[in-house]
């Protein structure tokens, strides 16, 4: 019998460990299949000290910690685990509250009193307390309960009880609510078990009014001002952060009265923010949130937002990316206060570095990258850390003048190598690179790091609010340490959660692979979540900004937002702005035998569902001729009760035109392939069939309708979170793009221009693509309709 490989053995050990903590077998096996969650859960179990097992209740809470713990608060995870194993945090509600509190706290010092208060530690809720709350909630909702009986939304009732008693045992709450309902209503009747009847709709109703999917209800944040949480510039005198040092000292960073007064005099008290992309790739939907935060706050407070290119790496910058970023920022509806480059400040940054050395806060180091990594892991000082200031000044000048080889020296900040925060491990301020800079030319051969430059430039530009995503929170200490060391103005820093959208990847490295390895058709491929891709797909900046606003500016990290929420906002926008038209993707010829070839009837089709009869601009003309085309999928040889398309001997309505009845089917020699349908129309319109089909027709005898190409897009990845997969490229959806080259459209479309958007009835919303030519238009499907006609043979 062959020996098991190490991987198989490790998985068996992990499975055994997970079963010990009470996970059910299915959950345990699914966890083992996910390397990231396996690593996290194993670490949590070890840190909690329960490798020999624990109760199922504790195990389930540990599993939640492993999958949902906020990355910005890792220093506090051991504390939470002890609260769990000691049964101080013992319910899901308590754990959710604890995770929320820790996410807001981040890497700052944890106030245990506030933590315990926030998650209900020590709060005991008796059964009598729960019974009293249930009685109150049921009484308040009694009229609804009596009307709907057992069809009442029990979840809402439970929610009302939870608001009164957030730490109550959920099982007990459910049992008491069920008992109270039985007390009032008695046994269920047959009527209670019937599904509520829905109002019957016409089968071919066009999507007149888009509604959100069940998972995408319009959140309250959209109706609030998301910028109310930010302080005014004149209030920027409080302690920004505390930086604990390994020797026991604590640095409390804040602006002096003189620094704040100087800043306010320079700005006139205006809010100034900055949007600082690195020009090394195309912006994606995550940047849309950053723009909404940075530009949005400035606009809300009548201030200004810099568009600042963080171009400290001369090898990564491309003019293509700079041009794209400027253009896409404008397309998103934002107007920069000024466009600046970090390289504009290279001279000032250099002078600040010299001053930092003079103050004893920086030194020239000769360690290699590997040595720096090793010393950081061991928390050891560099051998050159305590060299004389004069020596570092001379060597830094030699670095500037090009006298030292690339890789032989760096300038490092003298922070705290024994700190608990790895972002205080003597970060590099300057590196040598003998590479001309695209913006600054060949003046410099030393370039500042992001950690050194961005906070100083924030101060130079008098930025009032420096806003960034949560992964930068641990850098807050080094940010303020540097500004304090130089004695210059300190902006207010605040971190918010990244925007993570399902069924896509957004890391620049992964996006670059998709593009360079030709998995997609460039940075603006409509399947990508780049802003260029979303624009090409037909999405509007209004819809994208509404989506971002709906997410709110929160600190809850790690949440994966369903792409359906974005699609909801897109439908809401396009439903109001996209005129209707008809396109047949897979045409099936229908010959109207009781209409002469040259006797086409002109009919009015609506551009808008609420078009008024006296408004000619709300309609377009289409000919109803003796040759029309319907979707091939709207015809069947065998009719059925629940089918609303066309079949032999059956009638349907051609939208805006007449009822037609199939009288004959012409088959090919194989007796299977349908070549054409023959039908008669009812000029009196007395026939009232249920099915309504979209269609196009020959504009004149023997002349085909307008031929167009249509591209249908689906999710680029099959999994909700492909970024978590080891073989993420293997998760690509092979059917994410379907090209239909010979679709037919109504003549209304012939003058459509790049970017024009339409609702193709029963098919979805579409936009004109840049690949269109005078000979042939190309349309991209932006989103499907909320519902298709359903009964139209689709």
Curated annotation (Swiss-Prot):
Spans annotated as Disordered: 192-217
CDD domains under this entry? GlnRS_core (cd00807)
Name by which UniProt lists this protein: Glutamine--tRNA ligase
Q: What class of enzyme is it?
A: ligase
The short sequence motif called 'KMSKS' region sits at: 505-509
Q: Where is this motif: 'HIGH' region?
A: 277-287
**GO cellular component annotations, sorted alphabetically?**
cytosol
EC number(s) recorded for this UniProt protein: 6.1.1.18
Q: Does the keyword Hydrolase apply?
A: no
């Amino acid at each position: 019998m062959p020996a098991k490989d190490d991987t198989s053995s490790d998985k068996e050990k992990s499975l055994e460990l997970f079963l010990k903590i009470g996970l059910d077998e299915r959950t345990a096996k699914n966890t083992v299949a996910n390397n990231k969650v396996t690593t996290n859960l194993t670490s949590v179990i070890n840190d909690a000290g329960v490798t020999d097992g624990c109760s199922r209740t504790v195990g389930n809470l540990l599993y939640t910690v492993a999958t949902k713990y906020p990355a910005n608060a890792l220093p506090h995870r051991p504390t939470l685990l002890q609260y769990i194993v000691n049964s101080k945090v013992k319910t899901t509600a308590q754990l959710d509250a604890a995770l929320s509190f820790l996410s807001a706290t981040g890497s700052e010092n944890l106030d245990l009193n506030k933590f315990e208060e926030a998650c209900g530690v020590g709060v005991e809720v008796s059964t009598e307390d729960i019974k009293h709350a249930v009685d109150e909630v049921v009484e308040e909702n009694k009229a609804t309960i009596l009307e709907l009986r057992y069809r009442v939304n029990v979840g809402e009732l439970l929610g009302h009880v939870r608001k009164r008693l957030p730490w109550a045992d959920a099982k007990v709450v459910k049992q008491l609510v069920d008992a109270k309902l039985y007390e009032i209503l008695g046994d269920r009747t047959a009527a209670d078990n019937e599904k509520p009847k829905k109002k019957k709709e016409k089968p071919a109703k066009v999507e007149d009014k888009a509604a959100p999917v069940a998972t995408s209800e319009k959140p309250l944040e959209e109706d609030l001002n998301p910028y109310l949480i930010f302080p005014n510039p004149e209030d920027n005198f409080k302690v920004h952060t505390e930086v604990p040092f390994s020797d026991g000292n604590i640095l409390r960073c804040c602006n002096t009265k003189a620094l704040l007064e100087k800043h306010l005099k320079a700005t006139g008290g205006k809010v100034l923010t900055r949007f600082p992309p690195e020009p090394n790739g195309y912006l994606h939907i995550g940047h849309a949130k950053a723009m909404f935060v940075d530009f949005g706050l400035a606009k809300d407070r009548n201030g200004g937002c810099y568009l600042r290119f963080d171009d400290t790496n001369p090898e990564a910058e491309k003019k293509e990316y700079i041009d794209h970023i400027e253009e896409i920022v404008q397309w998103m509806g934002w107007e920069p206060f000024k466009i600046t480059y970090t390289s504009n400040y290279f001279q000032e940054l250099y002078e600040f570095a010299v001053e930092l050395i003079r103050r004893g806060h920086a030194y020239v180091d000769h360690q290699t990258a590997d040595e720096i990594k090793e010393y950081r892991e061991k928390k050891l000082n560099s051998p050159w850390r305590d060299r004389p200031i004069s020596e570092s000044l001379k060597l830094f000048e030699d670095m500037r003048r090009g006298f030292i080889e690339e890789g032989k020296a760096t300038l490092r900040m003298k922070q705290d190598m024994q700190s608990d925060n790895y972002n205080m491990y003597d970060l590099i301020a300057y590196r040598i690179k003998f590479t001309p800079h695209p913006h600054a030319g060949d003046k410099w051969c030393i370039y500042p790091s992001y950690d050194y430059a961005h906070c100083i430039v924030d101060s130079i530009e008098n930025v009032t609010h420096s806003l960034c995503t949560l992964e930068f929170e641990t850098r807050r200490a080094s940010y303020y340490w540097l500004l304090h060391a130089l004695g210059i103005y300190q902006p207010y820093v605040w971190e918010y959660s990244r925007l993570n959208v399902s069924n896509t990847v957004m890391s620049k490295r992964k996006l670059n692979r998709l593009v360079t390895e030709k998995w997609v058709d460039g940075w603006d491929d409509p399947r990508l979540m780049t802003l260029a891709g979303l624009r090409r797909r037909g999405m509007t900046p209004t819809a994208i900004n509404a989506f971002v606003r709906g997410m709110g500016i929160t600190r809850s990290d790690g949440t994966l937002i369903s792409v359906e929420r974005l699609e909801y906002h897109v439908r809401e926008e396009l439903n109001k702005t996209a005129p209707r038209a008809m396109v047949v993707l897979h045409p099936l010829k229908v010959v109207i035998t009781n209409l002469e070839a040259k006797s086409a009837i002109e009919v009015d089709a609506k551009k808008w569902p609420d078009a008024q009869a006296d408004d000619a601009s709300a309609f377009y003309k289409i000919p109803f001729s003796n040759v029309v085309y319907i979707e091939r999928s709207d015809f069947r040889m065998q009719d059925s009760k629940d089918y609303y398309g066309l079949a032999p001997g059956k009638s349907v309505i051609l939208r805006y035109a007449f009822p037609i009845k199939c009288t004959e089917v012409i088959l090919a020699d194989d007796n299977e392939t349908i070549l054409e349908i023959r039908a008669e129309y009812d000029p009196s319109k007395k026939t009232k069939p249920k099915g309504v089909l979209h269609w196009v027709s020959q504009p004149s005898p023997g002349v085909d309708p307008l031929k167009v190409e249509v591209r249908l897009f689906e999710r680029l990845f099959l999994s909700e979170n492909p970024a978590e997969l080891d073989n993420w490229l293997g998760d690509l959806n092979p059917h994410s793009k379907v090209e239909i080259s010979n679709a037919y459209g109504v003549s209304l479309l012939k003058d459509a221009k790049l970017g024009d958007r339409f609702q193709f009835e029963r098919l979805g919303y579409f936009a004109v693509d840049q690949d269109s030519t005078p000979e042939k238009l190309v349309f991209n499907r932006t989103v499907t309709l909320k519902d298709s006609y359903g009964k139209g043979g689709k």
